[in-house]
């Protein structure tokens, strides 16, 4: 068993080994990053076909680098469905699992790569 620092142990246990999925009741949706606007804002194309202005919260901004083409889980704001904030960034392996499960269509990934 490897001995990991507290920082690395915490990162692995954050979601209990499960990939967080979108939940319409909680107001979350999967989006793909189209471009950075500067600061902590970006434009993302969501699965419902809407382009949204997304904010990267401070706790993620310092830990996770979000670049164009990344697939993210977004929590929509209650008072404005055109805006939201990043909840989770999916890794490449997680995106492949989401495609296998049918949560994200392969066409969405292909269309996102063409936009960039």
Swiss-Prot record:
<protein>
    <recommendedName>
        <fullName>Translation initiation factor 1A</fullName>
    </recommendedName>
</protein>
<comment type="function">
    <text>Seems to be required for maximal rate of protein biosynthesis. Enhances ribosome dissociation into subunits and stabilizes the binding of the initiator Met-tRNA(I) to 40 S ribosomal subunits.</text>
</comment>
<dbReference type="GO" id="GO:0003723">
    <property type="term" value="F:RNA binding"/>
</dbReference>
<dbReference type="GO" id="GO:0003743">
    <property type="term" value="F:translation initiation factor activity"/>
</dbReference>
<feature type="domain" description="S1-like">
    <location>
        <begin position="17"/>
        <end position="91"/>
    </location>
</feature>
<dbReference type="InterPro" id="IPR001253">
    <property type="entry name" value="TIF_eIF-1A"/>
</dbReference>
<keyword id="KW-0648">Protein biosynthesis</keyword>
<keyword id="KW-0396">Initiation factor</keyword>
<dbReference type="Pfam" id="PF01176">
    <property type="entry name" value="eIF-1a"/>
</dbReference>
<feature type="region of interest" description="Disordered">
    <location>
        <begin position="1"/>
        <end position="25"/>
    </location>
</feature>
<dbReference type="InterPro" id="IPR006196">
    <property type="entry name" value="RNA-binding_domain_S1_IF1"/>
</dbReference>
<comment type="similarity">
    <text>Belongs to the eIF-1A family.</text>
</comment>
<dbReference type="InterPro" id="IPR012340">
    <property type="entry name" value="NA-bd_OB-fold"/>
</dbReference>
